[in-house]
């Protein structure tokens, strides 16, 4: 029923209204956008055909409680007119409405709720955090390395405080240096880097005149000639290529040493024996020749033997006179070692020319080095002499300048000393003159003071003498005059005391008059009248009397600003208040309209008491209060009213406040009047 009505309503508009029905289903409570895109049962879309003239047909009932609704008549689809290609006009006609073919029904898919996102686990979050932290750290470290190559201050901070920062910066700098200078890097890479470690030289390292052999070390001094010959032959065959290669290399390097003007330092080769002087440089060669085993003398061949040449004479070791340079000594030592090896191997004929050439070249190199040393020493001596002469000349000039400056300084100091002496002498003379003038003035003042003292003393003595003579002449009349003057002074004191008494009495009388004036103004008034002027006059007359000031300050300001009620007004107002209090005393706590009416009637019919009635009821208290008011006793009347409870006291609160104001004013006036009486009694 509901689907039929929805389908009939959908035919009226272009958009289906299934979204409204979707809210009525319990299983499809989702958003409007999701619901509007769903397909419902029996929702097959029909081709839309424009029918402007056909009126819309509404269902019989749109209420949800209708039993059934007849389906609307399906609209007829008009055939689409086609135009033949031959009759195609030049201007195309207006486009007709698009005919949508019917869509096949699809199964209804219930709406799927969005799956909630799973929360990431702790390890996954930790992994993401560590990964991001690592990436950020790498980026920051790379940025720090790059910026440290630009800024020197940041370079110092980065290499000092960041771990592995110095290694990274040095690695990048080495790469940059190798990229800029590839040739230098290729030449430097062959040399070992100076790591600062201590180099240990083995005891048997370095070049030696002995040929290294793999046999027994003492085989050459052995008595067995056969074993020595075999060992020597094996050693020569093994070491011959190395010795020849070293000799060729040294021979090739000799011309280079000659062509250079300065001797380049050679890397030190640790040797076992150090050469101290040229005399000892040839000692290893001689020792080696002496230590060699004695060879058989040459014997001429017999007639029946083949002819043979005598062996060549051994090569003499090199001796360079005056070879003090350590490089030349090392070369001589090296060449002598080579000669020793050649002589030992009987290769004299083969290497004699080369060794001779090497000797000549080494002698030339030594001579050139000596010449260069002599030349450098001569130039150095000349430069030293020139420097010494320059230093002597500069020292002489400096001494002369210092002497002239000292002389000028001494003259200036002498001149300043003389000027200072003159100034000090002048100042001391002025001080002496000033001291003398002051002493003279002091002496004159002392003399004048002495003269004045003597004059005063003489005048006193003269006065005493005159007084004595006058007293003697007048028989003591001067003493009587003194007594009269003292009596007159006593009379003056007595007169001043009586004047104070009179003033105090006058002020007391004025205070009495002011109090009576305030009281009269309050009693004569027929309605409340302010009495600010009277209080101001009373305060001025009291002349800052603390008692009067305290009494005036105890009065409520509203009392003297607006005035207080008279006795007649208080009695009249009490009668009205008493009537209301009697009515309220007859009412219960939750009184209604009837209770109020009955209380009003009963208050009229009640008998009133008279005099000082006994009892604590409301009527007795009101009767006593009225009696006290008629007698003029406001204090007791206020006490009686203050004893009421409940609504009776609430209704009489305003009247009680007025009575308290009147009592406060009366009490203050009584206190002021009592103070005035006490002052008058003190004067008596």
Swiss-Prot record:
GO cellular component: MICOS complex
The protein's name: MICOS complex subunit MIC60
Keyword Transmembrane helix part of the UniProt annotation: yes
Transmembrane helix found in the keyword field: yes
Any one GO biological process: cristae formation
Record text on subunit structure and interactions: Component of the mitochondrial contact site and cristae organizing system (MICOS) complex.
FT transit peptide: 1-41
Pfam families in the record: Mitofilin
TM annotation in the entry: 126-148
Mitochondrial matrix compartment spans: 42-125
UniProt function note: Component of the MICOS complex, a large protein complex of the mitochondrial inner membrane that plays crucial roles in the maintenance of crista junctions, inner membrane architecture, and formation of contact sites to the outer membrane. Plays a role in keeping cristae membranes connected to the inner boundary membrane. Also promotes protein import via the mitochondrial intermembrane space assembly (MIA) pathway.
UniProt similarity note: Belongs to the MICOS complex subunit Mic60 family.
Keywords noted in UniProt: Coiled coil, Membrane, Mitochondrion, Mitochondrion inner membrane, Transit peptide, Transmembrane, Transmembrane helix
Low complexity biased stretches: 75-89
Region (Disordered): 62-102, 189-224, 287-317
Coiled coil spans: 434-464
Compartment(s) of residence: Mitochondrion inner membrane
């Amino acid at each position: 029923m509901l689907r039929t009505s929805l389908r009939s309503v959908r035919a009226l508009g272009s958009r289906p209204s299934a979204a409204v029905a979707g809210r009525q289903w319990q299983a499809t409570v989702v958003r409007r956008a999701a619901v509007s895109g769903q397909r419902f049962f029996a929702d097959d879309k029909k081709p839309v055909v424009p029918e402007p003239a056909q009126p819309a047909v509404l269902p019989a009932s749109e209420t949800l409680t209708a039993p059934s609704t007849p389906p609307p008549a399906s609209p007829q689809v008009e055939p689409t007119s086609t135009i033949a290609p031959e009759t195609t006009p030049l201007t195309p006609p207006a486009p007709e409405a698009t005919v949508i073919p019917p869509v096949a029904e699809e199964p209804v898919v219930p709406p799927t709720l969005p799956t909630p996102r799973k929360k990431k686990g702790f390890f996954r979050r930790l992994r993401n955090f560590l990964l991001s932290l690592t990436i950020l750290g790498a980026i920051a470290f790379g940025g720090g390395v790059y910026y440290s190559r630009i800024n020197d201050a940041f370079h110092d901070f980065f290499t000092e405080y960041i771990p592995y920062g110095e290694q990274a910066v040095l690695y990048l700098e080495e790469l940059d240096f190798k990229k800029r200078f590839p040739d230098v890097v290729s030449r430097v890479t062959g040399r070992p880097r100076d790591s600062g470690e201590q180099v240990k030289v083995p005891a048997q390292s370095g070049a030696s005149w002995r040929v290294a052999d793999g046999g027994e070390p003492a085989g050459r001094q052995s008595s067995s000639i056969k074993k020595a010959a075999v060992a020597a032959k094996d050693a020569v065959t093994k070491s011959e290529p190395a010795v020849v290669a070293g000799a060729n290399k040294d021979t090739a390097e000799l011309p280079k040493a000659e062509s250079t003007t300065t001797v380049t330092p050679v890397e030190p080769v640790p040797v076992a024996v150090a050469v101290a002087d040229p005399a000892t440089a040839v000692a290893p060669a001689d020792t080696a020749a002496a230590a060699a085993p004695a060879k058989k003398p040459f014997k001429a061949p017999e007639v029946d033997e083949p002819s043979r040449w005598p062996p060549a004479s051994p090569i003499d070791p090199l001796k360079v006179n005056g070879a003090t340079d350590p490089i030349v000594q090392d070369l001589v030592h090296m060449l002598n070692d080579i000669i020793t090896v050649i002589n030992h191997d009987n290769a004299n004929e083969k290497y004699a020319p080369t060794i001779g050439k090497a000797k000549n070249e080494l002698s030339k190199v030594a001579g050139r080095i000596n010449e260069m040393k002599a030349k450098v020493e001569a130039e150095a001596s000349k430069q030293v002499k020139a420097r010494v002469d320059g230093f002597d000349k500069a020292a002489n000039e400096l001494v002369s300048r210092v002497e002239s400056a000292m002389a000028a300084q001494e003259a200036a100091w002498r001149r300043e000393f003389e000027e200072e002496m003159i100034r000090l002498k002048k100042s001391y003379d002025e001080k002496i003159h000033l001291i003398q003038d002051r002493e003279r003035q002091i002496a004159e003042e002392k003399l004048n003071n002495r003269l004045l003292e003597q004059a005063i003393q003489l005048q006193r003595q003269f006065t005493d003498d005159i007084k004595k003579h006058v007293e003697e002449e007048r028989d003591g009349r001067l003493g009587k005059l003194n007594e009269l003057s003292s009596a007159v002074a006593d009379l003056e004191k007595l007169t001043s005391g009586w004047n104070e008494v009179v003033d105090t009495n006058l002020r007391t009388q004025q205070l009495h008059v002011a109090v009576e004036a305030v009281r009269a103004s309050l009693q004569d008034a027929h309605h409340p009248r302010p009495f600010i002027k009277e209080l101001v006059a009373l305060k001025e007359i009291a002349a800052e009397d603390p008692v009067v000031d305290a009494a005036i300050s105890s009065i409520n300001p509203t009392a003297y600003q607006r005035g207080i009620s008279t006795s007649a007004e208080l009695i009249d107002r009490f009668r009205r208040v008493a009537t209301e209090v009697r009515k309220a005393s007859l009412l219960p706590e939750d009184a209604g309209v009837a209770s109020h009416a009955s209380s009003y009637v009963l208050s009229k019919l009640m008998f009133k008491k008279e005099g000082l009635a006994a009892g604590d009821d409301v009527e007795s208290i009101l009767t006593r209060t009225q009696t006290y008011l008629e007698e003029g006793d406001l204090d007791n009347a206020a006490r009686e009213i203050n004893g009421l409870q409940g609504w009776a006291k609430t209704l009489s609160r305003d009247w009680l406040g007025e009575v308290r104001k009147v009592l406060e004013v009366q009490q203050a006036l009584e206190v002021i009047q009592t103070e005035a009486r006490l002052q008058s009694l003190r004067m008596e």
